[in-house]
């Protein structure tokens, strides 16, 4: 059942319903970055299942961000950020990312979002 598979892929259903596209870019990337942090922590603790789940949530949030019409001019950077995270977790780490560099990149957005409140 394709509909069931689609529903299973939607981990953040309330966000898909429209709330995500009302959030600022800083909030969106801060939230996506939280999933990166969770994936990094799970990897450090040897929990492949939690790592994979957090990575899937990150990908869903990044895909929602990339699809946000307000951010059309930022798609290249957003796609690159998504690519770098995927490269680290499931690729050859061609970008030579470290857990610290990934955390630092996304933490900057979370801090900016908090300052903006």
Residue ranges, per PLM feature:
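Surface-exposed peri-terminal alpha-helical interaction modules
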Residues: 1-117
């Amino acid at each position: 059942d394709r509909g069931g598979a689609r529903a299973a892929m939607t981990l953040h259903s309330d966000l898909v319903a429209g709330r995500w596209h009302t959030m600022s870019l800083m909030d969106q990337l801060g939230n996506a970055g939280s999933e990166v942090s969770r994936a990094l922590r799970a990897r450090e603790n040897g929990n492949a299942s939690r790592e994979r789940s957090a990575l899937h949530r990150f990908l869903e949030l990044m895909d929602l961000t990339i699809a946000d019409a307000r951010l059309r001019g930022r798609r290249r950077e957003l796609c690159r950020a998504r690519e770098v995270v995927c490269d680290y977790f499931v690729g050859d780490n061609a970008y030579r990312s470290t857990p610290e560099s990934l955390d630092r990149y996304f933490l900057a957005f979370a801090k900016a979002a908090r300052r903006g409140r």
